[in-house]
Amino acid sequence: MNVLIKKFYHLVVRILSKMITPQVIDKPHIVFMMTFPEDIKPIIKALNNSSYQKTVLTTPKQAPYLSELSDDVDVIEMTNRTLVKQIKALKSAQMIIIDNYYLLLGGYNKTSNQHIVQTWHASGALKNFGLTDHQVDVSDKAMVQQYRKVYQATDFYLVGCEQMSQCFKQSLGATEEQMLYFGLPRINKYYTADRATVKAELKDKYGITNKLVLYVPTYREDKADNRAIDKAYFEKCLPGYTLINKLHPSIEDSDIDDVSSIDTSTLMLMSDIIISDYSSLPIEASLLDIPTIFYVYDEGTYDQVRGLNQFYKAIPDSYKVYTEEDLIMTIQEKEHLLSPLFKDWHKYNTDKSLHQLTEYIDKMVTK
């Protein structure tokens, strides 16, 4: 969407949000803007027995996955046709919880008693995002202003460590006063059961008897740059291992494992080794004590096009490989030497993180 179209969209949203008056409702209202269910659903479930009215604005693709939620959750699909309905819901909310960059918020006029809380869809960051992304033309003042309008709509950020707060400050222009050091709701699932038992049960369920290696790469905008690891060759060279390629859903390839029905966190719970690149998943995997090998075949190009941050560049070279042959050799010869990196990114991620957030919501939302 180019700058002029975004500018017009912001204008329409601004006009509508000024025209639409907040609806009178019986209960205090919380609106969730959801692209990633694993970030938002734990919060909604934690509020199941609360007295709040809850509305979820989500993509048409994700809407069906909300059917398991309680009946008192309203769902609005985020399309142009429902724009008025979305703004009506937002206007009556006392708190808005988001998990991503939402263009709508750049034009939306918050009411005086509203707070927007960002629970970002990652435990950390190894690549540039926001205004540090090399794809953003910082010399284009109109483009930068549009991004800033969206970022400035957020009042607070949920974070699990100082490193991520540093990323938000660098990339989104956030301040220390905006940081909520509660930890992230998305990690709550890792504390709800004994991990070793869950791992054994999941492997049994999916018929995996070998060590499981999970490949979860970053999505590349040019689909030709997205590649799976040759499963047959990998398992031939490493007969004691099973490889699963978990690529982005938009990548269609009959040779890639069909694991679309298994969410990434479930696959991670089963895994013995993670293979990734510039994704935040190695940071999340460290919470599970799973080591990561960084298969970075396009490191130079990716750094030039998108940008890799100081935390990526601090990764030891011994954890990086650039070819499938080197990847296989690293597992054969060095697996026992690999330990999880980024464990210090979980200072505030605890089994109390979700409870801390719900207490904060209770404090901030007037009943």
Swiss-Prot record:
GO biological process, one term: cell wall organization
EC code(s) of this entry: 2.7.8.44
Catalytic activity: N-acetyl-beta-D-mannosaminyl-(1->4)-N-acetyl-alpha-D-glucosaminyl di-trans,octa-cis-undecaprenyl diphosphate + CDP-glycerol = 4-O-[(2R)-glycerylphospho]-N-acetyl-beta-D-mannosaminyl-(1->4)-N-acetyl-alpha-D-glucosaminyl di-trans,octa-cis-undecaprenyl diphosphate + CMP + H(+)
Enzyme class: transferase
Pathway this chain belongs to: Cell wall biogenesis; poly(ribitol phosphate) teichoic acid biosynthesis
GO MF term (any one): CDP-glycerol glycerophosphotransferase activity
Keywords on record: Cell membrane, Cell wall biogenesis/degradation, Membrane, Teichoic acid biosynthesis, Transferase
Membrane topology: Peripheral membrane protein
Record's subcellular location: Cell membrane
GO cellular component, one term: plasma membrane
PANTHER family the UniProt entry points to: TEICHOIC ACID GLYCEROL-PHOSPHATE PRIMASE (PTHR37316:SF1)
Protein family: Belongs to the CDP-glycerol glycerophosphotransferase family.
Function: Catalyzes the addition of a single glycerol phosphate residue to the prenoldiphosphate-linked disaccharide.
Name of the protein this chain belongs to: Teichoic acid glycerol-phosphate primase
